[in-house]
Structures are given as structure tokens and as C-alpha cells.
């Protein structure tokens, strides 16, 4: 993801909503950019923490360990986190962090040392009321716990709210493991209430955490999952797939393609199936100008980040396909991270039903706010989502007298 795409996006939104140059310039520039060079086992690694906007509260965003992490990417992701927290209507801003490293090349001890070094480099600019990191690509609850432990050592007191995505035993929140999928399911349920459907068939591209849990949750609610896929390919059964069996096959063999009660298909084929709901939950840019005209779903639920290109969006809208955009559809994850932060700060612990009830309330409210705007104008659902999120951030900036 390039930061130039953010600039282009803001120019487009600015023209639609008549935001002035000062307002747009404020959003184009992250408030703070922090960089460091870390060294583990004689090798040096670039580390970043970007705080895009704190007008609505402390910034929130994950830390990723990946060989392609760059400052440009982290800046772009921090911006999207500002939009996502505003969309979910939680009182937090957007941030992001990362280390340019291939964690598969490091031992567990080296990963722990690198994680603690990251906190030592940035502990003065993070904190429960300043910047709250979380897991992201190739970072885990265990890594978050190491980071939290290091932060507490450095400041000399307990501060579990400094980081979310921790293990349950260390102050993590129940439901966090399914939060992204569950939040998306709540949004989809609201959309289905407003669209006349003769059947409820679903295809899920991606069978990692979000895709697998979405398939399970939707099947439990009576929707028919007819196709799923992972990086090795997909499986189709128009009579409906047994999701529990698929989970077992994936766990035991490494791929859903080894499931025997169905027809093997490609990831590209899955996207073009004649289903009611399409759930891209794996990669960016899978729905493009090349295949958008072949999409037959009535609803696209974006559990992945950025699965639809802007050119494809126009085609889908012209076909009256409702796209539930990523910053809404997968905001369940950051919302339950917010709940974890609240529980830590209050020295409290919510049971699973409490978390689910609060998550549903947040996701339904966010959807309803956007749907109201969507029903009043000629812009697609994604554009309305972005407009509302940017307006919330700028309204907060105005109240602070910064714009």
C-alpha cells in the first residue's frame, strides 16, 4: 500500500464533501513519525511507529513483522486506522507500527529480543492514554505480552492497557479471536434485512482466522456456505459445505482442497460464483477491473483489507452490488481491542456474552449511520463510509481548534 493512494483518495473525498485545503492537508500528514534501528544477533532492522491522528482519542493500531514493511506502508496503514476507528465510532485515533524483518528467519529468542527492543525504542511515545499497539501481520498474543512486560519494566508500574491482543491470562479480552469475523457477520445481517433475497448462499475466499470464523458463524445462522478457498485453491458444493469437517481437513492437511465432498475450483473461479454473498477475507486487490463484471454476488463483505480496487468498485456499483467496505466490515477486531483496553483501564473483566452484545451494538450503530447517508444520495456505500469517517475526524479537529 502506497501513501500516494491516500493523497489521491483524500483529493477525491475533498471534492465530494467540499473540504478545504487546510482540512485535507491536516489529514494528509501523520502527526508523528518515529523511527529506530534495532540490532539483534548482529543484524540491524528498521523499526517504525506512526501516529496519524489523535483528535478522537489515543491512537490505535497494530505492529507487523514483515520483510516488506516500509515507512510509506506504515504511514498509509496508520491513516486507514484513523478511518476505521472513526467508522466504528470508538474514541480512538489511528496509528501503525512495524519492523522490516522476516520473522521466519529468527529463533523464538531473537523474536522476543526484537520485540522488547521495539518497546525500548518507542516506550516514551506509546502508552494507555497515548498510543495503544496490537498484533498484526506475523505478530502474536505472546509477542504482545512480551512488549507489555517490557513497557511495564521501563515505567516501573503495571499498565496492561498499553497493548491489546494479549493472551486471555494476561489481560486479553474474550471474543478477540473471532472479533473480526463476528463484527462482519453483524454488519452483513443488517444489510440482509434491507435487501430482498430469495436465498442465502455464501462463498468465502480465504480460510484463515477471519474467513474460517465467518464461515462457521454464517453457517450457524442458517446461511449456506457453498464454496471456500485458501492459498492452494478452493472447494465447491452447491448443496452446502460441512464447515466443521472443512476446519478439520484444513488443520490436518494444510488446505481445504483436500476436502473430498466437493468440486475443486480456483480462487479466481470462486469470486465469480453465482452466490448471494461473497466474502473476500484474504488478499488485497482480488476484485479488479478485469473480473468485476463477472461478479454475480448481491453483497460483497470485505473482511480482507483492500480486496477491491477503485476501478472495480465503479463496476460493482453500476451492477447494484452492495459492497460493505473493509473499514466497516472488519472493524470488529479493533472494536474488541478497544473493549480490551477499557477492561484493562477499569481493572475489569467482561464475559463473552457481554463482549458480543457490546460489539453488536457498535457494529449495528455504525452500519445504520452509513446506511442513512447512503439512502439519501447517489454515492456508493464505500464512499459514504469514507465521507462519514473523515467528517468525524475533522469535527473533532475543529472542536480542538486545530483546523
Task: Give, region by region, the residue ranges found by the protein language model.
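Glycine-rich phosphate/diphosphate-binding loop of Rossmann-like nucleotide-binding domains
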Residues: 164-167, 172-274
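Short, Gly/Pro- and small/polar-rich lid/capping loops
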Residues: 2-37
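Conserved active-site and cofactor/substrate-binding residues in soluble primary-metabolism enzymes
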Residues: 5-8, 69-72, 106-117, 138-142, ...
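Adenosine-phosphate binding glycine-rich loop
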Residues: 191, 293, 297-403
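Rossmann-like adenosine-cofactor binding region
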Residues: 233-323
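Glycine-rich, N-terminal phosphate-binding loop and its surrounding beta-alpha-beta segment
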Residues: 30-103
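Glycine/serine-rich phosphate-binding loop and adjoining beta1-alpha1 elements at the start
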Residues: 85-198
Amino acid at each position: 500500500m502506497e501513501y500516494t493512494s491516500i493523497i489521491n483518495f483524500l483529493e477525491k473525498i475533498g471534492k465530494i464533501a467540499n473540504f478545504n485545503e487546510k482540512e485535507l492537508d491536516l489529514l494528509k500528514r501523520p502527526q508523528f513519525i518515529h523511527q529506530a534501528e534495532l540490532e539483534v544477533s548482529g543484524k540491524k532492522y528498521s523499526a517504525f511507529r506512526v501516529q496519524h491522528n489523535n483528535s478522537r482519542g489515543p491512537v490505535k493500531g497494530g505492529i507487523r513483522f514483515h520483510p516488506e514493511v516500509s515507512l510509506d506502508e506504515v504511514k498509509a496503514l496508520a491513516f486507514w486506522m484513523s478511518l476505521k476507528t472513526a467508522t466504528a465510532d470508538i474514541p480512538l485515533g489511528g496509528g501503525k507500527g512495524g519492523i522490516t524483518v522476516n520473522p521466519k528467519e529468527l529463533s523464538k529468542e531473537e523474536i522476543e529480543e526484537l520485540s522488547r527492543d521495539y518497546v525500548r525504542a518507542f516506550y516514551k511515545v506509546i502508552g494507555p492514554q497515548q498510543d495503544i499497539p496490537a498484533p498484526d501481520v506475523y505478530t502474536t498474543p505472546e509477542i504482545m505480552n512480551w512488549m507489555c512486560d517490557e513497557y511495564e519494566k521501563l515505567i516501573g508500574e503495571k499498565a496492561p492497557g498499553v497493548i491489546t491482543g494479549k493472551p486471555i491470562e494476561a489481560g486479553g479480552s474474550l471474543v478477540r479471536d473471532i472479533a473480526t469475523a463476528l463484527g462482519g457477520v453483524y454488519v452483513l445481517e443488517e444489510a440482509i434485512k434491507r435487501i430482498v433475497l430469495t436465498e442465502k448462499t455464501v462463498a468465502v475466499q480465504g480460510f484463515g482466522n477471519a474467513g474460517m470464523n465467518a464461515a462457521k458463524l454464517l453457517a450457524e445462522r442458517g446461511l449456506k456456505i457453498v464454496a471456500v478457498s485458501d492459498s492452494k485453491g478452493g472447494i465447491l458444493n452447491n448443496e452446502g459445505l460441512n464447515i466443521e469437517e472443512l476446519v478439520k481437513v484444513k488443520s490436518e492437511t494444510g488446505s481445504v482442497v483436500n476436502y473430498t465432498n466437493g468440486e475443486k475450483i480456483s480462487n479466481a473461479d470462486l469470486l465469480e460464483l453465482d452466490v448471494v454473498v461473497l466474502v473476500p477475507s484474504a488478499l488485497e486487490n482480488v476484485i479488479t477491473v478485469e473480473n468485476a463484471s463477472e461478479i454475480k454476488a448481491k453483497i460483497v463483505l470485505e473482511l480482507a483489507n483492500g480486496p477491491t480496487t477503485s476501478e472495480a468498485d465503479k463496476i460493482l456499483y453500476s451492477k447494484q452490488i452492495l459492497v460493505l467496505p473493509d473499514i466497516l466490515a472488519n472493524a470488529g477486531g479493533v472494536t474488541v481491542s478497544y473493549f480490551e483496553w477499557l477492561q484493562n483501564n477499569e481493572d475489569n473483566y467482561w464475559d463473552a456474552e457481554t463482549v458480543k452484545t457490546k460489539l453488536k451494538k457498535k457494529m449495528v450503530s455504525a452500519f445504520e449511520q452509513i446506511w442513512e447517508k447512503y439512502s439519501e444520495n447517489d454515492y456508493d456505500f464505500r464512499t459514504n463510509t469514507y465521507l462519514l469517517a473523515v467528517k468525524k475526524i475533522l469535527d473533532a479537529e475543529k472542536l480542538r481548534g486545530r483546523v
